[in-house]
Amino acid sequence: MMLPNIQCKKNMLKYVNCGIVFQEIPDEVTLSINISNCPCHCPGCHSSYLWEDTGEVLDEKEISRFVGEYGSNISCICLMGGDAAPQEVNGLAAFIRKAYPAMKVGWYSGRTILSSQIDLENFNYVKVGPYIKHLGSLKEKTTNQKLYKVLDDKSLEDITSRFWKK
């Protein structure tokens, strides 16, 4: 008996929009890429339009197009979301690190812990934590969210307080 040739379709990242921002990663001019199909569905989310599986494919070719368009104006690329496909997020981060070694890479995850499919070697910054309205965003001292800088030894330095007004 011959079995049918079944190919598994990998999760494909899609993005809805992107833009240059100055507040997502301290001391960086960041191209923030908003990834759709967010599984977190945080109550009070300011980006609920990212819950649906919509947008354009986000792959190595699209990252290269972004770098060609914005490269001299940015120092960091931050993938905003992608919790439904952390392996693909990790793959894009690895690509950015290899193809554009001077470019910093960040990831904003809505999960409380990093996926085991994430290799910190591929990131300079990672944010973890769902948005919980009564605790506030990163700029609030009461937030549950944390932004970490990945150090050379792959340990994490909590830099969340950099968002707080003195």
Model-flagged regions — what are they?
Residues 52-64, 84-121, 125:
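Canonical radical SAM enzyme core domain
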